Amino acid sequence: MTRLLPRWFVERIAPVRDEDELPVSTLELFFDLIFVFTVAQFTAIIAHDPAEGLLQTVLMFGFLWWMYAGYSWLTNVIPPVRPARRILLLCAMAGWLVVALTIPAAFESGSVWIAIGMLVVVLVHGLMYLQAARAFGPVFVANLAAVAAVFAAELGPAGAWRYGFWALAAAIVWSVPVWHGQRGLNLHPAHITERHGLVVIVALGESVVAIGIGARGLPVDADLLVAAVLGLAIGACLWWSLFVRDLPGTEHALKATTDQVKRVRKVLAGLSYAFIPVLVGILVFAAGLKHAVGHALSPLDFESALLLSGGVAAFMLGTAGLRWSMRLPRPWERVALAAAVLAVAPLGLVNTALQLAAVVVVLVGALALEGRASAAPRPAPAE
């Protein structure tokens, strides 16, 4: 497919060696700021209607996360060091902004603009990859097919039709690793790990924003301060659970995996697939926190209590998937931790602060036990 592109556009990209530094650029950080807005839109949808909003979020997030993670892979393989690449990334940011702006309308009135935004995102992504990777052609076609499904969803009637085509879009892109294989990519372990970690940091920022939004117009009293501080404590525990041991262990495991195909498979399983419950869990928790702020001394409704505990539990299940994929120690401990966090959800029906405090106690206790059991992750076997 690179033969269809002008010669001046196609270039040979030399992969960066594992031992050489490939820091995340400021342009990539700027690019990630769009994700802040995207996360905020999904959080608002879930907070407004937990059941239907969560279904809509999962369907849209399936396709959007595939493409967003795709840009992390893109800048890993083709660093944005030339002006042309930087301009293309900025054009992609415009597409992502259009997508984020139109997320609330996607399942309500329908908006062809979200499909147009995704088309821009996919075209820029594909053209940049095709500069250097001819094998990307079939993936590009699959991404375009997913965009076509989004056009069909937004131009068709509301209801089952729209849900069905969004599900089809997600199914198309996530089937790619099954039939295309994982050859032709050389991923830099430190960069790909840091890039995905930064996306989680951005998403965790939404939980802090949720505190501010929930507190808007409320008096600064014990109700507000207790819920805010406990909510921040939970966010801190989520950060600790991923960044203190698991992500450093992930980078080490990827460096130890010298076979590039096996490395790509680990990144797919651990940083792409497993990060879906990690990120959606943060969105769900933030939506529940919006309802909790300002009502710490009152009971929560069932849906809000489930959002608070369910979001944290989903996050922990995602970290279990990461540990399993990277062969890090004790993934099943995180499954047990997710169950324990869910078990305290009924406390919110009695008192909001009681549930928040119970979640904090469960998380801190589990993380303390993990820290005592292993001060550092065991090295993954070289492959």
Please provide the spans of the model-predicted regions.
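Loop-to-transmembrane alpha-helix initiation sites
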Residues: 160-165, 351-361
